[in-house]
Swiss-Prot record:
One of the GO biological process terms: defense response
Active site: 167
UniProt record similarity statement: Belongs to the ribosome-inactivating protein family. Type 1 RIP subfamily.
SUPFAM superfamilies with a match to the protein in the record: Ribosome inactivating proteins (RIP)
UniProtKB keywords: Disulfide bond, Hydrolase, Plant defense, Protein synthesis inhibitor, Toxin
Reactions the enzyme catalyzes: Endohydrolysis of the N-glycosidic bond at one specific adenosine on the 28S rRNA
Lineage: Eukaryota, Viridiplantae, Streptophyta, Embryophyta, Tracheophyta
S-S bridge residues: 217-254
Name assigned to this protein: Ribosome-inactivating protein charybdin
Marked site: Important for catalytic activity: 79, 117, 170
Function: Inhibits translation in rabbit reticulocytes.
GO molecular function per UniProt: rRNA N-glycosylase activity; toxin activity
Keyword Disulfide bond: yes
Length: 257
């Protein structure tokens, strides 16, 4: 079925040239607040993920020394879906033409790769863990997205933006890691445990946290993060910067007692 075009709910802007670890941290925290529909023990929860209604997005406008690129991110799941080159007007969408799902961004040109990290890494010809994530990398990403038509450069730059904004918004440890190392002159890599233990589990962790909160009969399965056993949903919640709200978590709880 043809999907509907995404409506943009708000736009946030960030100048990469003057970015510091502190202003980056503040930006991520403000972004979480802008996205929140409610809070669970102080942690923002995203709007209900809805596949029937018109998809909602937000734009992130990034500038560096006069160069501009705007990326469009799906609000319900924080997946980067497209971007706009400098002065081009036309949007480029992360979707292979062969998927036949239609355009999430109206009038967009479909790229040769989809939004998953597997497809992005294949197009970039580089592993997620081999890419650098710091201020230099972000400046380079903005410059490349503003003007480059090279698939490898585009894909690598989109990975940098997705990690440093989408993943950092999802996870406290990832935001802290990027903030602490932002101004490093050496390449800054993503630790493997953050990819394996956190990033690959955000949807599942979100579900477990909200289900535990809504359903007294839900049995929480202990999780392992960085070698530590996490025994409760409240403990797991501490790792999340924002929680995805899946419709399944709102099913009526069992009859307790």
């Amino acid at each position: 079925s043809q999907c509907k075009a995404m409506t943009v709910k708000f736009t946030v802007e960030l100048d990469i040239e003057r970015l510091t670890g502190q202003t980056y941290t503040d930006f991520i925290k403000n972004l979480r607040r802008s996205l929140a529909t409610w809070y669970l023990h102080g942690v923002p929860v995203l709007p209900l993920y809805n596949q029937e209604a018109d998809p909602r997005g937000f734009d992130l406008k990034l500038t560096f020394r006069g160069q501009v690129t705007t990326v469009r991110i799906h609000r319900d799941d924080l997946v980067l879906r497209g971007y706009q080159m400098q002065g081009a007007g036309k949007w480029l969408e992360l979707e292979r033409p062969s998927t036949q799902t239609g355009h999430l961004i109206e009038g967009s040109e479909l790229l040769e790769f989809g939004p998953s990290y597997e497809e992005l890494a294949a197009a970039a010809q580089q592993d997620i863990l081999d890419i650098s994530y710091n201020k230099n990398a972000l400046q380079d990403a903005v410059s490349k997205l503003a003007v480059s038509t090279n698939t490898r450069d585009r894909a690598r730059s989109l990975i940098v933006v997705s990690q440093m904004f989408c993943e950092a918004t999802r996870f406290v440890d990832i935001a802290n890691h990027f903030a602490f190392n932002l101004e490093s002159s050496e390449p800054v890599k993503l630790p493997q445990w953050m990819q394996n233990d956190l990033e690959k589990n955000w949807v599942r962790f979100s579900f477990m946290i909200l289900k535990s909160n809504a359903d007294p009969c839900y049995k929480f399965e202990p999780q392992t993060i960085y070698g530590k056993i996490i025994k409760t949903a409240d403990e797991l919640l501490n790792f999340l910067g924002i929680v995805e709200q899946h419709p399944d978590t709102r099913s009526p709880p069992c009859a307790a007692g």
